[in-house]
Curated annotation (Swiss-Prot):
InterPro entries cross-referenced by the UniProt entry: PLAC_motif_containing
Organism, scientific name: Zea mays (Maize)
Pfam families: PLAC8
Protein name: Cell number regulator 6
Polar residues bias locations: 1-10
Swiss-Prot/TrEMBL keywords: Membrane, Transmembrane, Transmembrane helix
Comp. bias (Basic and acidic residues): 16-29
Gene (name only): CNR6
Length: 239
């Protein structure tokens, strides 16, 4: 029975002889597991999420900042925090850009390198006097620590600009923090809080209730009279 089925339906597989079969040692490991070439997945990718972008995609143009670099008086609370506790304000800005970093970490780094460096320079000048050699060492230390601070804080300003597609205002982020660190810190906080307020604003839909309907006595009498007349028109036909 099986032989009849085999003869009626021949096998679709080709049997190789020993000469035609390739030896196992000629097959290199991983040769059969090569990646598949998919042209659709080789286009431009988003720098934030890594998703493949369509060919017709054009990145949005950079927008200007909503407040200027010297607009500290627009938000007095932010201005006071940035003046007396700039490390706290900087930590909150970093946490908004990088959610995986708690605000306490950049706050401590800012307090050590910026506030700590300034305090150390003042104490050195008080206890050791201000001679030419000491002044040179103090100035060199302040310039080096300030340069590190401007580079570190400028990186997060760049991240904020990429997140909200903002222009360089008034110049490169690192240079802004190097020259106007306190003003830049307050500007970033104002921009961040303003963007969050715009995103959280939900449009409200006003629904007006239907008008109150009242029935007067005259309409009620007319309605009862109409119902009675309908019943009076009924005719009884004997069978």
């Amino acid at each position: 029975m099986a032989e009849d089925a085999t003869s009626s339906h021949p096998s679709r597989y080709v049997k190789l002889t020993k000469d035609q079969d390739a030896p196992a040692e000629d097959i290199r490991p991983g040769e059969l597991n090569q990646p598949v070439h998919v042209p659709q997945l080789e286009g431009r990718r988003c720098s934030e999420c890594g998703q493949v972008l369509p060919e017709s995609y054009e990145p949005p143009a950079d927008e200007p900042w909503t407040t200027g670099i010297f607009g500290c008086t627009d938000d007095p609370e932010t201005c006071r925090t940035g003046l007396f506790c700039p490390c706290v304000l900087f930590g909150r800005n970093v946490e908004a850009v990088r959610e995986d970093i708690p605000w306490t970490t950049p706050c401590v780094c800012h307090a050590v390198f910026v506030e700590g460096g300034i305090t150390l320079a003042i104490l050195t000048a008080i206890f050791h006097g201000v001679d030419p050699r000491t002044s040179f060492l103090i100035g060199e230390g302040l310039v080096f620590s300030w340069w590190l601070c401007a580079t570190y804080t400028g990186i997060f300003r760049q991240g904020l600009q990429r997140k909200y597609h903002l222009k360089n205002s008034p110049c490169d982020p690192c240079m802004v923090h190097c020259c106007l660190h306190w003003c830049a810190n307050c500007q970033e906080h104002r921009e961040r809080t303003g963007r969050l307020a715009e995103n959280n604003a939900v449009p409200m839909t006003v629904v007006n209730p239907p008008p109150v309907q009242e029935m007067s006595m005259l309409e009620e009498v007319e309605e009862k009279g109409a119902e009675k007349s309908e019943h009076d028109d009924v005719e009884v036909i004997p069978l």
